Amino acid sequence: MSTAERAPILLTPGPLTTSYRTRRAMMVDWGSWDSDFNELTASVCQRLLKIVGGEGSHTCVPLQGSGTFAVEAAIGTLVPRDGKVLVLINGAYGKRLAKICEVLQRPFSTLETEENVPTTAADVERLLAADPAISHVALIHCETSTGILNPLEAIAKVVERHGKRLIVDAMSSFGAIGIDARKVPFDALIAASGKCLEGVPGMGFVFARSAALEASAGNCHSLAMDLQDQHAYMRKTGQWRFTPPTHVVAALHEALSQYEEEGGLPARQRRYASNCETLLGEMARLGFRSFLPAEIQAPIIVTFHAPRDPRYRFADFYQRVREKGFILYPGKLTQVETFRVGCIGHVDAAEMRQAVAAIGEALRELEVLEI
């Protein structure tokens, strides 16, 4: 992939580097009520449902805004006001789930583990057995603050066995790590346009179990975030209730075409895994230590311990690497200083090697010697 047309390269978990074709798709203006745009939206939703294997059981409801908008909409719509959510936390985005429940005044309890410790099915089993008031369990599949992968399928089986409902934030995994609605029972799985599908940010979407969505009328705290009302209106008219992000939808439609051309989820996962493996190997040669062990590291974003050298300052390091054509991500841990490097986006292993070379050059220029 040529870098000439797209510098700097974003090695972040989203927004991320997109292809020229995806950006070009935004050069066309669309009427938000026009039949062509309605068909575009319908096509996007059908293709998304196919990725998750949700045809016949789930409904794809798109929503304007960031992924967090869609997460809040899912909780607000699908959790009744007298429900109770068990929130599983091992990072910043799990904490955000709890904050959403607090703001929406949905009763909740939490299970928080260390940032490098995945939640286990045994943890969930114990807590559900102890508290029959819990109606829903909410978790992050891939916690973006570290890159840790939580055991979704095992947790989903426990939740189902207890007769509870599962809400999955799959923002950083959907499209690159397999999730099959026929094997993983969930009431809602939430993702967004600007992550592993390599679209641009601005649209979230919720795969809602159709029966649960139909039963949720009147639950939502908000007009704009009411997924049941959004779906009912779209089913009746083919249109969004309120002004849609037309260019974002068009870009996602094109990004999905490229996703399919590449070979779908297996091919996307292979490329990201190659990116991650290359990144880890090259960074280890520079002396960097990754925060997570390999067995729980998702090929989405890697957290590295910051250099121990007292001359290291992230802001200076970031700027030097940026000048060389690569944008990194600050750390988001509470206990140790780190920084993050994304493996996703329209990039390949060759560009990961170029990025690590730029990191090495930046450290030498800054005279950061102790890694």
UniProtKB/Swiss-Prot annotation:
GO BP of this protein: organic phosphonate catabolic process
Keyword Transferase: yes
pH dependence: Optimum pH is 8.5-9.
InterPro entries, sorted: Aminotrans_V_dom, NH2EtPonate_pyrv_transaminase, PyrdxlP-dep_Trfase, PyrdxlP-dep_Trfase_major, PyrdxlP-dep_Trfase_small, SP_NH2Trfase/AEP_transaminase
PANTHER family reported for this sequence: 2-AMINOETHYLPHOSPHONATE--PYRUVATE TRANSAMINASE
Cofactor note as given: 1 pyridoxal phosphate per subunit.
Activity regulation: Inhibited by phosphonic acids and very slightly inhibited by aminophosphonic acids.
UniProt KW keywords: Aminotransferase, Pyridoxal phosphate, Pyruvate, Transferase
Lineage of origin: Bacteria, Pseudomonadati, Pseudomonadota, Gammaproteobacteria, Pseudomonadales
Record flagged with keyword Transferase: yes
Recorded GO MF terms: 2-aminoethylphosphonate-pyruvate transaminase activity
Protein name: 2-aminoethylphosphonate--pyruvate transaminase
Enzyme class of the recorded protein, top EC level: transferase
E.C. designation(s): 2.6.1.37
Pfam family, one: Aminotran_5
Induction and repression of expression: By 2-aminoethylphosphonic acid.
Entry-annotated residues carrying N6-(pyridoxal phosphate)lysine: 195
Thermal dependence, as annotated: Optimum temperature is 50 degrees Celsius. Activity increases from 30 to 50 degrees Celsius, the enzyme is inactive at 70 degrees Celsius.
Cofactor(s) demanded: pyridoxal 5'-phosphate
Function: Involved in phosphonate degradation.
Family from the record: Belongs to the class-V pyridoxal-phosphate-dependent aminotransferase family. PhnW subfamily.
Catalytic activity: (2-aminoethyl)phosphonate + pyruvate = phosphonoacetaldehyde + L-alanine
